[in-house]
Amino acid sequence: MAKVRAALERIRDPSVQTALSEAAYTHVRPVLKESLVNCPYALSNDEADCLESFGITVNPYANQTHTHAACKVIENRMLEIVGMHLPKHSCTMLFLKRSKLRYMRRAAILKDVFLNKDVEPKDLFRYDRDTIRSRLQDIDTKIAYMSDTLHFMSRREIVQLFEDSPKLETLLATVVLPVEALHKRTSLYPSLYSINYSAKGFEYIPGNHGGGSYFHPYTTLEWLKVRMINAEDFHKLSTGFILTFQLVESLGANHLFIVQKAKLLTPQMRTFCRDSLVTLPQVFCPAAMNANRPLSKTKAMQMLLYCKSVKQVTERDIYAKIRQIIPTSELELYDPDEIVHLANYFFFVSSLDSITCYEDLLSSDIWMRLTRPLRTAVRKFVELFKGKQDFDKLLIALKWQPFSYSLEPVDFTAYFVSRRVRTLAKMEDISWHQAAELARRLESEPDLLSWEDLCSKPIADPLASVSTPPLATLTSPAISESRVTDTSSPKLTNISVESILHPTSSNHATIAESLNPKFCGWTRGDFHHMIVNQPSDRLKGCRSWSYTTSPDVDLMLENLLLTPIPWESRLSDILLTLNTPANACCIQILDCSAASAWVDWSVQPIKTFPVAFVGMGETTLTFEDDSTLPLKEGEFVFFPPEWLARHKYQIKTASNLHLCATFLVLDTTLLGETLANNCIEPEPLRPTASRKSCQPTPSVDKSGADSPPEKQIVTPIVDAAVLSCRPKLQDVTKPTKVLMAAETSDSVADSLPWASWVNLLQKHGFKGNQQQIAQDGQLIIPISDIRKLPHIPFPEEVPETLRETLKNIKRFPVEITMQHKRAGSYDSDIKNNRTGKLLSQMDNKWKAAFAYKLQQEDRKVCGTIIHGCGGSGKSFAIQEWMRSLKEDQSVVTVVTPTVLLRNDWQTKLPILPADVFKTFEKSVIQPCNPILVFDDYTKLPPGLIESVVMHHQNVVFIILTGDNRQSVYHETNPEAYIAALPEAVEIFSPYCEFYLNATHRNVKDLANKLGVYSEREGKLKVNFASHHLKASRIPMLVPSTMKRNAMFDMGHHSMTYAGCQGLTAPKIQILLDNHTQFCSERVLYTCLSRAVDRIHFINTGPTTGDYWAKLESTPYLKAFIDTYRDEKTEVYNSQPASAEPTEPEAPATHFPTAPKPLLEPLVEKLTDKEAREIFSPAFGHSNAIQTEDSVVQLFQHQQAKDETLYWATIDTRLAISTPEANLREFNMKRDIGDILFMNYAKLMCLPPEPVPFEERLWKISADEVRNTYISKPIGNLVNAASRQSPDFPKNKIALFLKSQWVKKTEKLGTLKVKPGQTIASFMQETVMLYGTMARYLRKMRRRFQPDNIFINCETTPEDLDKFIKSQWDFSRPAHTNDFTAFDQSQDGAMLQFEVIKAKFFNIPAEIIEGYIYIKLNAAIFLGTLGIMRLSGEGPTFDANTECSIAYNATRFHITDDTAQVYAGDDMALDRVSIEKDSFNRLEKQLKLTSKPMFPKQVKGDYAEFCGWVMTPAGIIKHSLKMHASIQLQKKINNIKESARSYALDLRYAYKLGDELQEHLNEVEADYHQQSVRDMHLLHQQDVLNKGSASPPHVFEKTADANTAGSSKTHKRNALKKKKQTRIAEILPSPDATGLSSLPFRFF
């Protein structure tokens, strides 16, 4: 082919080349057209290259977008391949939409059958409703196709599909499973998809877009290994069959399998990709210190040759080479430790000698040849002791092992339920097990009953019309519909939470004593016949058999899935004796004198039925607390499922071939059948007299006759005390039920779920006899978060009185691990002054000694964790014990998080010295006693507890009290290590045995709203106001530190929500503002739980529905808001309506005639012309105040020819610097620019990853810039001829003064002339290049710009009007900025922001460097300018706008629901934004400053933007500016040319009519009326009514000779028209870089 190509390239004849191109096009065109079917999407280069490597043709002109286009193309290609394999007749399509047929190239005439099933919620919208089936069965075609669903199904379901479809022979199935997930490797094709791994499975993310991701358990990867499935009948009624799997095609993670119902040959290996990876040998010890992950062999060879080609390789050289050979796009595929191990391996290899240490054969004499074997043997013997030489070590280290993704297929076995059994079960409404028994009887006794008899129509019942059957049964006729609960069933009345979770705190000393074995009468002989010739699974010390009622029931022991065996009738008989349901039974035969492994049922999906354990021999059950329960033969016990979820047991026996059975009720798989009819239940027992109390009371109708009793539903036989969740009380009419004293203890135990904990509640000061309801309707449990922990003895240093005190409240010592890493983090922050106040002031020697003492391993210390809500008395018992101590005690030290809490302890224990109570920093510096009490430890810095315990080695016992529901410590310094540590409550909560959810502080109403139990009587009083309580020292709680400081300065006793922990007050004030909605539940719980019975809410925020909705989203605060509203509603409803008539509203009137003249107040303030002009000794006065007309003199007329104004503008607006100084400033402020961009990116919703460069969009932007420039008048092009020259310096600026009338409202009638504005004219090529960059970045920005941000660029006033009406919120003050010297203040930080933004959008590096160059070296005739914004540099407007956005995003907290408008240096927000605390440090490093203004958004005080006033009715022009501009145009005789433009702007206010009365004050209304009158006099009424659709008015051509300056203007214009104009040809500049895609030359 190369010779053919070379021959074609030698052809130079244009006609022949044209003919060849046309011939090639005829071949290419149909290919491209066909490729659009599978690939209609626009692809990146990497995606297109990857697809072409798969043999998939892509169309480079496709323009559709998709979140995962490449993976979608592969899916379409797979469908095409499937279509090639399918025959041209009807087939069945499973899990496929009809619209996919076009990708398979199949016509509708084939009449394919579609069968789908709803598995996920999105399937409800994916498939056509007429194709949905409740069960996939009865496939009538020989061939079927299953689309991308096989990996979500189990092997059992596929086997069942073939069994239920006898005609089905071949199944084509596609799966989406990345083979690299078998090894937990990164994606083989990162441009197509990525993979996230977790403990439960992995996430397949096509197109790296989370919206299309799928989660797979690791077990689904077994589909890649399946070769054959041996299908066997679960009930042994029919012969099985074999399914053969063969991989037909593999494209990335998509694979196509053919499943044939036959035993066929398949390849021995299953190949997915070429082997290109190797694993490096292990050369270091331990094995984990080696580079164990596969590496590309090419990269490994590159590294080896580099290490051996460099004279002396250093560690840094190796890291540099690794960075060089790994592309930037692949860096995320490597882990840091992997790179380190890789570098160590090659550094080790580089240090070994590669010159052979063996002798050569050519120079050996006869003596050496004869003695060579001996010398070789001696050498090997010496190496056993001395070690191998470097060359041998090198060869061993270079034995790379190939790493392959190829698999060896595996055979599996799966069970199915025969079609006959399913049919019988459905016809007779019986379980599969019963149907299987019936089928066996049909086969064994065909004369007695045949299959046809079952299928025939049933005979009518002659007794159906009889009201009472002659022989009524004593029990319910159907088990499946109703069942009478037998009270003799194994209810766990003897098993309680106290006895199981905390056996030492109940009447039973151990778990074993709390269980009550019973006798069932079954022996080992009753089971032996069942397990003969049945497959068993070998486990530790035993053999196991798994009997299940369905193959869908999976039973697992010791992480091994047991082989299912069909249910035996003998097991159903045993269930009758035990009176418990079950669908699984595990039978175990233990070896003699052996003990089984610890049995853990927590991995099983056990339902709420108890688990029955039956022992058939002398058995001993051993529990975690070392207690034992002996069982005799035939005895059984019940375990509640809640207990099994947390505990394990072990089976021991001394008898030979001991047998035991465990009965369970388990759930099924995701796509399996439900177990409603597959659960074996015992026959119902007849109620006896002893059970009358358990029977429902029959209802009585109006006639007095008893109505039939309702059917009883089978309920879980579990005592209420072991329920892990609070019961939902549907019929509670009162929030509290108090048990009377006359009730017995048994009735108390029956009515209270926490009956076994009442004694503990009483020891904490509660009666514990009330049922209280939380705000959500749930029963409040006073004891929660119960854990079973192993106890350890108290240390000898703990006094006996403290031991008894803790035991009395059921707080026992446990072993707590103090992590040295947490202590080290706190120590590092102290050492480097990142946290702390007192400790950071310690000298360096103390800090060094402190750090040295903490350099140790984890320390285990004895301690007790006490958790409880506020006011529960967590520290009461400890304080009572401390009151008994002597004054000079040296036993205990109390550590508190705040001074307030320390003073509280000292007040309650005045007898003890003050040094016993320390704040947390003092506890580090000063010595501590052996017993440490950390009160409210959740507010201590992370790592401090560990640091104190490790620092004071004499500490042997610690007590931690706190509330894990309240706020925790917050580190304000993000650089501190402890800011990234888990909270202390997360570390120590697992060591707490229970949580006391009861309080003495809050009244019952308040506590119940917080979900807390309380017995304190009283009424909760809640009131709202917009102000605080004056002349009051009631504590005020505020959401932010800023508000707290402000309130404190005003004399209030203020605290933050999170910082009020430890406060208790009868009444509190809570300030609600916009920050409240962002507070967490912990913070609000802390805040609301401070009061006893009165709360005063202060609402300083808006009262809109959105605001209340946000506050109501907080569960705790919603309860108080609802309470307040209910009280207000009652007050309003109790007040009758006033009988007096109301006065009607006044009608809207037309605008009155405005007084004249309106501008006179401004004219009166004017002084003489000379006093207002700027004076220069060199050039005299400026000439900005022109004519003698006083109205014209209100406006400054800045002209380019005014030398005085020109030099005054240069002195004011420009700053002269040097390139070196500019570069220094740029480097010094890079960090600030980075912060600006990060805030900008967050506000503008930019993606997390950089955006690829789009060459096509760049070309479009370049064409727009070029067309805009060429569309200018020829005269303008000729005047700029010098700047079009390639000899014009790239960094030079031609400086001009901008000619303009100054019409800004704030500068109207300014007494002193202000400097003007400069126009900086760069080289034309420079302007067009960076104008292109600005347009490109503008287009890219719009893709991500959120809807609540409006940028007034390439928009119309109509767009702005729509935005204001739809997005702007006028119910709150607005926010605008008045920047000072905006252009001159854009320094190096802003330049870095622009550079980072350009890099983020992947602007070519040479363009960015060129932009930096002109910004740092911009020069005028006076020298190099400082870094600033110049008006003619190309991206002026866009850059100004972006810098304004970045500045505001960095300075203020701008929420997502804030409407924002930007244009250059003009901006406005529809809410007042709070300044960030971090801006205090940034403000000094930014030149740019601004003065925020806050319009109240009421009549006369609305926000302004680009000359428009934003009102609730829409935008209107500023009345004063509009009127003054019209008067100016009238005075200079230019009104006729500009009247239409002014009328179009005025129309937005004019069309509002009388509604303007609500938005304009009296003065503004006068200006507006006069402007409208002027427009009517100028015949612009049609424009005011119809807008731009009205035709322009033609004025008569008249000249006003008396108007100043008008005759000169007309003469000058006429003279210009007569001048002959030169034509200049603009040639494109050559492409200096070779990048033909960019239209301008780079530098």
UniProtKB/Swiss-Prot annotation:
This is RNA replication protein. Residues 686-711, 1131-1155, 1587-1620 are annotated as: Disordered. Residues 997-1132 form the (+)RNA virus helicase C-terminal domain. Keywords: ATP-binding, Helicase, Hydrolase, Multifunctional enzyme, Nucleotide-binding, Nucleotidyltransferase, RNA-directed RNA polymerase, Transferase, Viral RNA replication. ATP binds at G868, C869, G870, G871, S872, G873, K874, S875. Residues 1136-1155 have a biased composition (Low complexity). The keyword ATP-binding applies. It comes from Narcissus mosaic virus (NMV). GO terms for biological process: DNA-templated transcription; mRNA modification; RNA processing; viral RNA genome replication. The keyword Chaperone does not apply. Residues 690-700 have a biased composition (Polar residues).
